[in-house]
Amino acid sequence: MMRTQCLLGLRTFVAFAAKLWSFFIYLLRRQIRTVIQYQTVRYDILPLSPVSRNRLSQVKRKILVLDLDETLIHSHHDGVLRPTVRPGTPPDFILKVVIDKHPVRFFVHKRPHVDFFLEVVSQWYELVVFTASMEIYGSAVADKLDNSRSILKRRYYRQHCTLELGSYIKDLSVVHSDLSSIVILDNSPGAYRSHPDNAIPIKSWFSDPSDTALLNLLPMLDALRFTADVRSVLSRNLHQHRLW
Amino acid sequence: MNSLEQAEDLKAFERRLTEYIHCLQPATGRWRMLLIVVSVCTATGAWNWLIDPETQKVSFFTSLWNHPFFTISCITLIGLFFAGIHKRVVAPSIIAARCRTVLAEYNMSCDDTGKLILKPRPHVQ
């Protein structure tokens, strides 16, 4: 009798200790992410020279079209058997969306530095979200990323894409008629097939916590706003698109 | 789009890159200065700590307590590394390297000051 009670007590204790340990690991993982992000050299806003300021006043303000999935975030829903992220990585936020009358939970992971990226580029460009996902999901993600800063107000979804050979193509003329001042940032080359000279490719992101692809783009995006026509630079694209 | 406009655009593009990297220099210089000062303090502190005959007799923590100058500068140095000073002292080259990563996609490159290097378009085979 005494023995069974002792065993039971021990088992409860072990279970409790295991829970405590996993909670501790969870906290540690979050902290490590913060430390990594803090250590990385970001991109401080530095003042413009008079020549550059003058140039900026002569050219139009550009539009930056952003993709969501695998560009700014990565998500998986609870029905997926093998999630692409490492198990145990805490999601940044969880979305509950009803699709075809079924409630689905999406675990959303933000790409490293995405908040900083959006904060900085929103000062240079008019931001537009253009995603090939469904509106109900896309708008919820955009709301979370916007975080009531009102920087992601214009949004386009799957219904604004054209379906060609099984892939969704994003038609930039829907967003803006003047192609000299619009840039699209997307991880899938298929999305900007009709506007290759306006595209900035980016590597697809799934889980790497030390990814700096968004920070890498900042110097280029900073400099690009001084051009009269973004295609002067972007049309030099070799389109050696690796299948990312 | 004529080539004159394109050249003008590329010039403006390059101007911002060089200007940004140039603007980074003073801050980088300050970080380097700070790293040197703290390193020298730690080194002198360590020397004094090691040559003190008391250090070997008393316990580790007591010896640290006896040499607050070494302890404080050492903690500061560790703190600076945690804050990523080893990256901050080379910030301009990090930014230039990031530019190169992105510009490679556009058949261009840049040097450490941000000056553009345009490459000839490769022949289609």
From Swiss-Prot, chain A:
Record-linked SMART domains: CPDc
TM regions (residue ranges): 7-29
Positions of the FCP1 homology domain: 57-224
One GO process term, biological-process aspect: protein localization to nucleus
Similarity section: Belongs to the dullard family.
Protein role: Serine/threonine protein phosphatase forming with CNEP1R1 an active phosphatase complex that dephosphorylates and may activate LPIN1 and LPIN2. LPIN1 and LPIN2 are phosphatidate phosphatases that catalyze the conversion of phosphatidic acid to diacylglycerol and control the metabolism of fatty acids at different levels. May indirectly modulate the lipid composition of nuclear and/or endoplasmic reticulum membranes and be required for proper nuclear membrane morphology and/or dynamics. May also indirectly regulate the production of lipid droplets and triacylglycerol.
Record gene name: CTDNEP1
Pfam families the record matches: NIF (PF03031)
Entry protein name: CTD nuclear envelope phosphatase 1
GO molecular function, one term: protein serine/threonine phosphatase activity
Compartments, record wording: Endoplasmic reticulum membrane; Nucleus membrane
Curated annotation (Swiss-Prot), chain B:
Keywords carried by this UniProt record: Acetylation, Cytoplasm, Lipid metabolism, Membrane, Nucleus, Transmembrane, Transmembrane helix
Cellular compartments annotated: Nucleus membrane; Cytoplasm
Record note on quaternary structure: Interacts with CTDNEP1; the complex dephosphorylates LPIN1 and LPIN2.
Annotated GO biological process: lipid metabolic process; positive regulation of triglyceride biosynthetic process; protein localization to nucleus
Membrane topology: Multi-pass membrane protein
The organism's place on the tree of life at top rank: Eukaryota
UniProt source species: Homo sapiens (Human)
Protein family per UniProt: Belongs to the CNEP1R1 family.
Tissue occurrence: Muscle specific with lower expression in other metabolic tissues.
Name of the protein in its database record: Nuclear envelope phosphatase-regulatory subunit 1
Molecular function per GO: protein phosphatase regulator activity
Keyword check for Lipid metabolism: yes
